[in-house]
A protein has these predicted regions:
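A short, charge-rich alpha-helical start-of-domain segment used by transcription regulators
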Residues: 1-18, 22, 28-31, 47
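Short, Lys/Arg-enriched C-terminal cap helix and immediately downstream tail that follows
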Residues: 20, 148-167
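Structural recognition of an alpha-helix C-terminal capping motif at a helix-to-coil junction
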Residues: 32-39, 48-59
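Arg/Lys-rich amphipathic alpha helix in sigma70-family domain 2
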Residues: 55-77, 95
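DNA-recognition helix of helix-turn-helix
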Residues: 58, 133-157
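Internal acidic/polar
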Residues: 72-95, 99, 125-126
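Helix-turn-helix DNA-binding module
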Residues: 107, 111-112, 122-139, 153
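A short pre-motif secondary-structure segment
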Residues: 116-117
Length: 167
């Protein structure tokens, strides 16, 4: 690996965990996936470690989501809704509500728009985003602009109780 792994870890780990959290919606699982991606980087010694880590981590999260979907189809016990826990503070409820609206708004985006937005939010450059998504570098700015606009529209619609079409 051309760059020092400790330095890459120091500068990339938190962004990678945030990126993964927005894919798996579980903080502990996001950290586990980030650590696994770094472990794989030690073995593979990629030329561009930062971009490689995000690509590998995204693939691991995608594989895990597919595996989980298969398990849910086969295990009827998982169809039960988990019970909500009561929170004592109105601020905590508001924050949770905002997180749920952001998550719902993200899910209304097309997979491509969501991926580009999350990669950008994680700190990847336009070149790194283009390499991972297969989009032309020049299309990244347009895609980001559209994704941001649609995210805001979906978030605001969620706040007012409206429905926004997916994609």
């Amino acid at each position: 690996m051309p760059q020092d792994l400790a330095e890459i870890y120091r500068t990339t780990y938190r962004a990678l965990v945030r990126f993964l959290y927005r894919k798996v919606w579980d903080a502990e699982r996001a950290e586990d996936l980030a650590q696994e991606a770094f472990a794989r980087a030690v073995v593979h010694k990629p030329e561009n470690p930062r971009g490689w880590l995000f690509i590998v981590a995204a693939n691991m999260a995608r594989d895990e989501a597919r595996r989980a979907a298969r398990e849910r189809r086969h295990l009827s016990l998982l169809t039960a809704e988990p019970q909500e826990t009561a929170r004592g503070h109105e601020e905590a409820l508001d924050a949770e509500s905002d997180r749920a609206r952001v998550r719902a708004a993200l899910e209304t985006l097309s997979p491509r728009d969501r991926e580009v937005l999350l990669l950008w939010d994680a700190g990847l450059s336009y070149e790194e985003i283009a390499a991972q998504t297969g989009l032309a570098r020049g299309a990244i700015g347009t895609t980001l602009s559209r994704a941001r606009r649609r995210l805001v529209e979906a978030f605001e619609a969620g706040r007012s109780g409206e429905h926004v079409a997916r994609g």
